[in-house]
């Protein structure tokens, strides 16, 4: 019999420093009105000097384990989805696993930018389906502020730092909390649309002058907008079809929190009322791979998500990459 993956715990972690739009007004050519109108963001959290991606990942993981009523030594694998690891090599996940105290279990990173959490979810679910693991910790964690050009208002006003985590356990298909159909995709011809151009062998970061903008994250916003809506919409329709759900059956849409215009347009394209689209972008900004688990945890804490609710997850990120998944919301302990 096919083993399902059931969401049994979740948690999140944000840095202590909150940066409002008013603060950004004092450091760059922008305004609160401009930022809100184009992104829907009012504030974002930024990691203090010395705070690493692994620090946020551990904080979110500890809360997820508490929510699942598990101890670290009961976890069989740790997956960290991130674009901003502690260092280029090795992966951040082994550091997270060691700090949690999981023991010598498999621990590795997944890099798919803003789609990373869904890629991690698919990988964790695959470990459970194959029998290689009974319980998997999947974390999305970012310190995106470290790769942003502080003078580029097209990116610096959008992104924030943070982490979200879920615990998956082996279960039965169809039980409350079970992860349903999941679809992923990519298109490498769009690699330059969302990227940090310098840092790899073709353009080593160490050889770049201090003022080289290519050291920072760049994005072609207008092209990304339409591609994100198109790809997430197509993926969502495929997942709904495979799950046997009608659009009217979906209680909540939880999409990657890119900006409020993308999430609103996506809801319209799928046919889900905008008021059924979960959003926390005003409070935390775009947190890349952390955005979906952060949105889930915050919606759960507010009482928005209730056991048995049918939830549709969608994401789009650099690569280009995208994904969607169906999930029946579980009875999860709040933390």
Curated annotation (Swiss-Prot):
Segment forming the signal sequence: none
Top-level division of the source organism's lineage: Bacteria
UniProt KW Lipid metabolism keyword: yes
Gene3D superfamilies cross-referenced by the UniProt entry: 3.40.47.10
Pathway the protein contributes to: Lipid metabolism; fatty acid biosynthesis
Full protein name: Beta-ketoacyl-[acyl-carrier-protein] synthase III 3
Keywords (A to Z) from UniProt: Acyltransferase, Cytoplasm, Fatty acid biosynthesis, Fatty acid metabolism, Lipid biosynthesis, Lipid metabolism, Multifunctional enzyme, Transferase
Species name: Streptomyces coelicolor (strain ATCC BAA-471 / A3(2) / M145)
EC number: 2.3.1.180
CDD domains, per database record: KAS_III
Reaction(s) this enzyme catalyzes, per UniProt: malonyl-[ACP] + acetyl-CoA + H(+) = 3-oxobutanoyl-[ACP] + CO2 + CoA
Disulfide bond annotation, renumbered to this chain: none
PANTHER family documented for this protein: 3-OXOACYL-[ACYL-CARRIER-PROTEIN] SYNTHASE 3 (PTHR34069), BETA-KETOACYL-[ACYL-CARRIER-PROTEIN] SYNTHASE III (PTHR34069:SF2)
InterPro entries, alphabetized: ACP_syn_III_C, ACP_syn_III_N, FabH, Thiolase-like
Subcellular localization(s) per the UniProt record: Cytoplasm
Known role: Catalyzes the condensation reaction of fatty acid synthesis by the addition to an acyl acceptor of two carbons from malonyl-ACP. Catalyzes the first condensation reaction which initiates fatty acid synthesis and may therefore play a role in governing the total rate of fatty acid production. Possesses both acetoacetyl-ACP synthase and acetyl transacylase activities. Its substrate specificity determines the biosynthesis of branched-chain and/or straight-chain of fatty acids.
GO BP, sorted A to Z: fatty acid biosynthetic process; secondary metabolite biosynthetic process
A GO cellular component annotation in the UniProt record: cytoplasm
A matching Pfam family: ACP_syn_III
The protein's assembly and partners: Homodimer.
Coiled coil ranges: none
NCBIfam families found in the cross-reference section: fabH, PRK09352.1
Broad class of enzyme this protein falls into: transferase
């Amino acid at each position: 019999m096919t083993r399902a993956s059931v969401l049994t715990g979740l948690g999140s972690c944000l840095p202590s420093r909150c940066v409002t739009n008013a603060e950004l007004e004092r450091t760059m050519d922008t305004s609160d009105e401009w930022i809100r109108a184009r992104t829907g963001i009012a504030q974002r959290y930024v990691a203090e000097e010395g705070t690493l991606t692994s620090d946020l990942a551990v904080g979110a993981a500890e809360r997820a384990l508490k929510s699942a009523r598990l101890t670290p030594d009961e976890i069989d694998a740790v997956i960290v989805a991130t674009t901003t690891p502690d260092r280029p090599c090795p992966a951040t996940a082994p550091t997270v696993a060691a700090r949690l105290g999981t023991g010598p279990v498999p621990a590795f990173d997944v890099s798919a930018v803003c789609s990373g959490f869904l890629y991690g979810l698919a990988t964790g679910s695959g470990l459970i389906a194959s029998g290689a693991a009974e319980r998997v910790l999947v974390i999305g964690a970012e310190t995106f502020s470290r790769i942003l050009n502080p003078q580029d208002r097209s990116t610096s006003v959008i992104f924030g730092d943070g982490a979200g985590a879920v615990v998956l356990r082996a279960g039965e298909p169809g039980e409350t909390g079970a992860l349903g159909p999941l679809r992923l995709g990519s298109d490498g011809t769009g690699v330059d649309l969302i990227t940090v151009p310098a840092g790899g062998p073709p353009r080593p970061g160490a050889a770049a002058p201090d003022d080289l903008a290519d050291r920072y994250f760049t994005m072609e916003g207008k092209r990304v907008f339409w591609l994100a809506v198109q790809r997430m919409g197509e993926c969502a329709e495929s997942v709904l079809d495979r799950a046997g759900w009608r659009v009217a059956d979906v209680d909540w849409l939880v999409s990657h929190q890119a900006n409020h215009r993308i999430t609103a347009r996506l809801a319209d394209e799928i046919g889900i009322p905008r008021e059924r689209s979960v959003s926390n972008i005003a409070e935390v900004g775009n947190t890349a791979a952390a955005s979906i688990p952060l949105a889930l945890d915050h919606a759960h804490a507010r009482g928005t998500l209730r056991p048995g609710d049918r939830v549709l997850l969608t994401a789009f990120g650099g690569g280009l990459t995208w994904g969607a998944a169906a999930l029946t919301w579980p009875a999860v302990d709040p933390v």
